Amino acid sequence: MSKKFAEQALQELISDSFKVAIVRPPMIYGAHCPGNFQRLMQLSKRLPIIPNINNQRSALYIKHLTAFIDQLISLEVTGVYHPQDSFYFDTSSVMYEIRRQSHHKTVLINMPSMLNKYFNKLLVFRKLFGNLIYSNTLYENNNALEVIPGKMSLVIADIMDETTTKDKA
């Protein structure tokens, strides 16, 4: 069964007593989320030199997702939603911020265009430093729903704090 078919079937069930909200988030990240963010944190702590590549990725902090879903439930809304953080996820900036909050000195280096072309052919490089964004107009706030606004540095600080707390437990 495809996602599209499943969503259509769910939408056919909508009634006054049964609400359906479909949430299509981008990459979810946080201290205990499975996936590539944990690997990125570990890699960041080990690499004193980071390529300065300006990429953009739509992402959503797990705490922002849970708050958004709480709003959907409390307002009993229906529809299709594409929530994302108020900032785009920039891999170099995130790695730099992780190192800064870990009290590690970091050097950002600009990549020569010839090397950049070579690295862009590598899947792992494209996954880390490629662009993948939702349009800001894709999610229209027509039901007074909002994703908690935040600054990347504050979100990373929260993640680092949670990670440190878990490691001590």
Residue map of PLM features:
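Active-site Tyr-X1-5-Lys
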Residues: 1-21
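Conserved donor sugar-nucleotide recognition element shared by glycan-biosynthetic enzymes
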Residues: 2-6, 33-37, 58, 91
